[in-house]
């Protein structure tokens, strides 16, 4: 057994000592190249000592290296400061029956997500009592490393920490119903969002060539690539920062890849299904689908009796 803070006294060379690494993700994002280098060296130290049969522990005697099967992964940032989800894939919009307006090519448009309902890998996707059509969305997004305001695209690129998978879970029937008022979404989205399983840092990301796929119970339902987007990561962040402060640890989802949801396929997940979203280099975000919640007596509005089922409009 070897304590990390006692390595020097145990004769570890400089190359064998674990450097200080931020103990939470937003601080790690903000540590930049120095933090990334420290993290890589810490991993190298852990591998070296493991090969020698040393058990690394912290100052309190707790192990610092664990088997994957012995831990439960949370969302990379369980409660980001802010989450925005953009529409940047034309195939998703047209696949859902929308006609693209000039605004789509002029600027990236988003809605703000509920940061209090984010779940991580393996956690259950909540099925609200008020929907009969639960849906997944196959997305990729990025975290900001440092804050900024009025960033140029060139500057914005240096403020991006890395990417992860984002499942923008949707209650499609009520979402379409409420957005018929040209506002929202609200109850159609606010109940649950999944992200993970890890953050792939930008030094390993080619943002235009990430291959993505969605499987339900092991069956391939959808696939696509990030090259189909309208805007780059930096363009999205630059636009968001115009006359507005952006903070470290914010999350920017880039929207659903074309064909990357049940709504476009007219195919619907069911309670007990396992939804797996995969992105090359990032891994697989896997979540079970929960059972439909029972609506408590008197809860909600008596004027709402459920939305009609929705089906995507198909182009001839």
Model-found features: residue ranges?
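Generic structural signal for buried aliphatic residues
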Residues: 140, 252-253, 275
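Glycine- and charge-enriched low-complexity intrinsically disordered segments
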Residues: 283-316
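Short, charged beta-turn/beta-strand-edge "cap" motif at the junction between a beta-strand
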Residues: 147-149, 257-261, 280-285
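Glycine-rich active-site loops that engage anionic ligands at enzyme catalytic sites
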Residues: 177, 197, 220-247
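A conserved acidic, glycine/proline-rich C-terminal tail/linker
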Residues: 232-270
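Active-site microenvironments in enzyme catalytic cores
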Residues: 3-216, 220, 308-316
């Amino acid at each position: 057994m070897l304590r990390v803070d006692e390595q020097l006294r145990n004769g570890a060379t400089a190359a064998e000592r674990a450097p200080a690494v931020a103990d939470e993700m937003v601080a790690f994002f903000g540590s930049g190249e120095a933090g990334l280098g420290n993290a890589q060296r810490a991993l190298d130290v852990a591998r070296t000592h493991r090969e020698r049969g040393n058990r690394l522990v912290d100052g309190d005697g707790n192990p610092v290296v664990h088997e994957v099967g012995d831990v439960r992964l949370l969302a990379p940032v369980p409660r980001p400061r802010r989450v925005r989800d953009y529409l940047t894939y034309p195939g998703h919009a047209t696949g859902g029956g929308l006609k693209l307006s000039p605004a789509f090519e002029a600027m990236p448009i988003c809605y703000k997500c509920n940061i209090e309902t984010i779940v991580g890998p393996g956690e259950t996707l909540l099925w609200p009592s008020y929907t009969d059509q639960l849906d997944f969305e196959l997305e990729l997004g990025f975290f900001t490393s440092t804050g900024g305001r009025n960033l140029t695209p060139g500057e914005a690129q240096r403020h991006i920490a890395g990417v992860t998978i984002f499942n923008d879970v949707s209650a499609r029937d009520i979402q379409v119903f409420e957005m018929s008022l040209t506002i929202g979404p609200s109850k159609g989205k606010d109940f649950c969002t999944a992200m993970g399983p890890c953050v792939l840092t930008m030094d390993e990301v080619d943002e235009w060539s990430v291959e993505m796929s969605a499987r339900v119970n092991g069956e391939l339902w959808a696939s696509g690539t990030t090259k189909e987007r309208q805007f780059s990561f930096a363009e999205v962040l630059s636009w968001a920062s115009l006359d507005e402060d952006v903070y470290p640890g914010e999350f920017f989802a880039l929207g659903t890849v074309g064909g990357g949801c049940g709504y476009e396929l007219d195919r619907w997940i069911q309670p007990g299904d396992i939804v797996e979203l995969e992105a090359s280099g990032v891994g697989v975000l896997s979540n079970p689908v929960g059972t439909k919640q029972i609506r408590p007596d008197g809860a909600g509005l008596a004027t709402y009796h459920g939305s009609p089922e929705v089906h995507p409009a198909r182009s001839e």
